[in-house]
């Protein structure tokens, strides 16, 4: 198991008039799906997550040295960003089956591993289901049903 920490930074300025989420297209060779722009429930802008490989799943402090890289990624789709208005916000851990794995080899993302667990009746593993896991939930349920009952 490998741990990909995602650092998030919030934007304190009022000069960006954004009313929707922004999910940039993934770039080949990157370990993640890009630095997103999301809005929290109060309408605050947040940028993240990035991908920082860490040894511990308990390392939840925002790595402030990642700010410059986040700014570079965000300016690709929001060139008017004032980086002086960005602050560390929070971090989370995403467990991964492989450290960069196929992504580092240029083969794309490895996700949606759905399989029976040999030796355990009725046990189905649903591994590495990331974005768009919720959108895919009905198709995932159908696959699980097929594995259990056919």
Model-derived features: where do they sit?
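Internal hydrophobic alpha-helix adjacent to the cofactor/substrate pocket in enzyme cavities
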Residues: 138-150
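Glycine-rich phosphate/pyrophosphate-binding beta-alpha loops
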Residues: 27-28, 123-137
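Repeat-unit-sized solenoid/scaffold elements
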Residues: 51-58, 127-130, 141
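Short, hydrophobic/amphipathic alpha-helical packing segments
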Residues: 67-71, 134, 145
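Active-site substrate-recognition segment that forms the wall
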Residues: 1-119
């Amino acid at each position: 198991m490998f741990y990909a920490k995602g650092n998030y930074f919030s934007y304190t300025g009022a000069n960006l008039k954004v009313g929707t989420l922004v999910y940039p297209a993934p770039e080949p060779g990157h370990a993640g799906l890009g630095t997103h722009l999301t809005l929290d429930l109060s309408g605050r802008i947040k940028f993240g997550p990035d991908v920082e490989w860490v040894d511990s799943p308990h390392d939840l402090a925002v790595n402030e040295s990642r700010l410059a890289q986040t700014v570079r990624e965000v300016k690709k789709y929001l060139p008017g960003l004032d980086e002086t208005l960005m602050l560390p916000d929070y971090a989370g851990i995403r467990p991964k089956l492989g450290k960069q794995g196929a992504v580092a080899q240029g083969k794309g993302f490895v996700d949606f591993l759905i399989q029976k667990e040999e030796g355990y009746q009725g046990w189905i593993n649903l591994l590495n289901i990331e974005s768009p896991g919720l959108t895919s939930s009905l198709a995932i349920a159908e696959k699980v049903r097929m594995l259990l009952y056919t």
